[in-house]
Amino acid sequence: MLQPKKTKFRRQQKGRMKGFAQRGNQLSFGSFGIKSLQSKWITGRQIEAARIAVTRYMQRQGQVWVRIFPDKPITKKGEGVRMGKGKGAPEGFVAPITPGRIIFEVEGVPYEIAKEALRLAAQKLPVTTKFVVRHDYDIQNQNA
């Protein structure tokens, strides 16, 4: 499961996710990717399930980049515990995602395979996504 090795503080405030992604909103490594269209928290398990779906469909060809990392600690109080008496114990980590954020990137496979692999990955995620292609990628001459 994805999580930081060490954090400065064990607990963090929930915060608000407003606006669009200011960073990580363009393809940097691969020719294809999926971009978020919603704000949501994505857990390490969801990221890993999507990554496995991509690599299995691509049959270990090409390369996959995961552009997000769950570094925000989430806390939860025990069952049946009343309100107050402090914040709960850390339960896990999430990656806060805003619209426009690139989640996965793929390189080294044809357009159709990349599109289907990323569609399968998108089904594992709690956000609606959009398939994006690098602006200088030529779909007609991909095998040339």
From Swiss-Prot:
Keyword Ubl conjugation: no
Any one GO cellular component localisation term in the record: cytosolic large ribosomal subunit
Keyword terms of this UniProt record: Ribonucleoprotein, Ribosomal protein, RNA-binding, rRNA-binding, tRNA-binding
Domain of life per record: Bacteria
GO molecular function annotation: rRNA binding; structural constituent of ribosome; tRNA binding
Pfam families: Ribosomal_L16
Gene Ontology BP term (one): translation
InterPro entries found in the cross-reference section: Ribosomal_uL16 (IPR047873), Ribosomal_uL16_bact-type (IPR000114), Ribosomal_uL16_CS (IPR020798), Ribosomal_uL16_dom (IPR016180), Ribosomal_uL16_sf (IPR036920)
Cystine bridges: none
Role description: Binds 23S rRNA and is also seen to make contacts with the A and possibly P site tRNAs.
Entry similarity comment: Belongs to the universal ribosomal protein uL16 family.
Subunit: Part of the 50S ribosomal subunit.
PANTHER family: 50S/60S RIBOSOMAL PROTEIN L16, LARGE RIBOSOMAL SUBUNIT PROTEIN UL16M
Alphabetical list of HAMAP family matching this protein: Ribosomal_uL16
Protein name: Large ribosomal subunit protein uL16
Source organism of this protein record: Porphyromonas gingivalis (strain ATCC BAA-308 / W83)
Gene (UniProt): rplP
